[in-house]
From Swiss-Prot:
Superkingdom of origin: Eukaryota
PROSITE patterns: RIBOSOMAL_L33
Cystine bridges: none
GO biological process annotation, one example: translation
Pfam families reported in the protein's UniProt record: Ribosomal_L33
Entry keywords, A to Z: Chloroplast, Plastid, Ribonucleoprotein, Ribosomal protein
Protein name, UniProt field: Large ribosomal subunit protein bL33c
Family, similarity comment: Belongs to the bacterial ribosomal protein bL33 family.
Gene Ontology MF term list: structural constituent of ribosome
């Protein structure tokens, strides 16, 4: 029997510096897709990931 899989959901992470950074390498907004466990992380996630548009590691926040 399969147990409930509702605890793990797919989320999108978006770079917060891409909107305000004027000196970017190229135009666009970096987005990553990942999975989070809703029971362990009930609040919105923030991860430091590489942004190819800013050409550096920036904070990526969870979007709806």
């Amino acid at each position: 029997m399969v147990k409930h899989k509702a605890a793990r959901i797919c989320i999108n992470l978006e770079c917060i510096d891409c909107k305000s950074n004027l000196h970017k390498r190229s135009n666009g907004i970096s987005r990553y897709t990942t999975i989070k466990n809703r029971k362990n992380n009930p609040s919105r996630m923030e991860l430091k990931k590489f942004c190819p548009y800013c050409n550096m590691r920036t904070i990526h926040k969870e979007i709806k």
